[in-house]
Regions:
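Transmembrane signal-anchor/signal-peptide helices with a preference for the extracytoplasmic
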Residues: 54-75, 229
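Short, charged, low-complexity loops and linkers
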Residues: 38, 59-66, 113-117
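Juxtamembrane loop-helix boundary motifs flanking transmembrane segments in multi-pass membrane proteins
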Residues: 28-40, 76, 154, 158, ...
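Alpha-helical transmembrane anchor segments
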Residues: 3-29, 40, 171-257
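Structured inter-helical modules in multipass membrane proteins
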Residues: 83-174
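A generic, lipid-embedded transmembrane alpha helix
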Residues: 42-59
Length: 257
């Protein structure tokens, strides 16, 4: 199911359940009884709502920062691979072609194989093998001139950065909100919505609309939190487009004899 459909379903089901819960309470608890609890319920929902709002805002900020950081790391990795390809063009034709082939193989493995596996929080053995091959290839490079020596030093720095950012990318795909925090988020939302049942509002329709609005907002924010929790899964995900852009540029470099 597409992410936006899942989000719509979650919000719809939550609003429906909240409405049914309100109907059950209003049928079983007389209005005069609810009116006597009005002040206490109002105070409690004010306190609980404030605490829950702070917690929810904190979690949203954390997952959004993690999502943004993951996107930035992917862009850095792509930029460093682009630098590697440009540095490779400064070497002699045989070495240049060997380097470009290795870089191209690594990027292709990341796009075709590692990106799908990261949605499950896993690294790709094919991409790992391509990275190991890149390191092996650069360790075997024998610079022949002062110019190649300088370029070689820069290339090793860039390759080290690529390796580091790949590791950060994989780690980000494995980070999840702890179970205890998930329970607190969903449980807190449920309790906050349930407290709206205990207000002595004469118009059930008006109370139902207020309850539905609160349930819809809370469930939608929780859905956003879940959607952003894994930055490489779902509709709201980091794409490999920066990698694809670099790969497309490398393919335009003329093949050396």
């Amino acid at each position: 199911m597409q992410t936006w459909l899942l989000g719509l379903a979650i919000v719809g089901v939550t609003v429906l359940v909240a409405h049914l819960g309100l109907r059950v309470v209003r049928r079983r608890v007389p209005l005069p009884v609810l009116e006597t609890q009005h002040e206490v319920a109002g105070f409690m929902i004010g306190v609980l709502g404030a605490i829950y709002a702070v917690l929810l805002a904190f979690v949203v900020v954390v997952v959004w920062d993690q999502f943004t950081e993951s996107k930035t790391n992917v862009e850095k990795e792509a930029n460093q691979l682009n630098d590697l390809s440009r540095i490779a063009q400064g070497f002699s034709p045989p070495a240049q072609q060997h380097m470009l082939d290795g870089i191209r193989s690594y990027i292709q493995a990341v796009i075709d194989d590692e990106w799908p596996t990261m949605s499950d929080g896993k690294a790709s053995p094919r991409a790992q093998a391509a990275m190991e091959e890149l390191w092996h290839m650069y360790r075997e490079v024998d610079p022949q001139t002062n110019r190649e020596n300088a370029l070689y030093s820069e290339a090793l720095d860039r390759l080290s950065d690529v390796s580091d950012n790949r590791r950060l990318r994989i780690n980000a795909s494995q980070d999840d909100i702890p179970i205890i925090v998930r329970v607190l988020l969903w449980g807190g939302g449920l309790i906050t919505i349930a407290f709206t049942y205990f207000f002595g509002v004469k118009s059930v329709r008006s109370q139902a609309l207020m309850t539905a609005a609160l349930a819809g907002v809370v469930s939608f924010i929780l859905f956003i939190v879940v959607a952003l929790d894994n930055p490489f899964h779902g509709y709201l995900r980091v794409t490999p487009q920066p990698m694809q852009d670099v790969l497309n540029r490398i393919k335009t470099i003329p093949t050396q004899p």
